Amino acid sequence: MYQIITPLNLALNTGAGFICRTFDRDAAFIQGYMQEAQFHQGAALIEILQNCPIFNDGIFDPIIEKKNQAEKVLRLKHGEPLLFGENNEWTILLDRMEVKKVEAASLDQAQWWIHDETSKFKAHVLSQLGQGEYHDLPVAMGVIYKTPRKFIEKQYNDYNSILEQKINQ
């Protein structure tokens, strides 16, 4: 079986500095994410899960219908623990490179995974939740990865300045 190629992992592996996922019925969040992406320095990708009534009608309904969101959607907030469920009773545990769904109450709070949107490693893991080998876990929604990048023009100008200094020495 082939490994699933996702837009988020593709963006992570090609150097995008802002990576986010949301769904089409989440208008309030989409607007905020669009503004963040617009003002982000560097490449940005927002994956929007959206049904197509002709080719894949209802494909995301098991995830994004209100009655399923508590168990199927993991809302990401920088600096906050990854909790989900009707009463936030579940968490995601990263244990020796293995991702597990565990009862939050069974762990000391120090063991909870705190979302760090600057961690590229954790961003790779979060982008895979809800699919492939992690199909039984909730789908991560929100800013998955964010780090400022220099614009290519700035890098080019910095490089030219260094070259000019070396030539003029």
Residue ranges, per PLM feature:
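Conserved thiamine diphosphate
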Residues: 1-37
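Flexible, low-complexity linker and terminal segments
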Residues: 54-169
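A conserved active-site cap/scaffold subdomain adjacent to cofactor or substrate pockets
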Residues: 17, 22, 40-47, 71-79
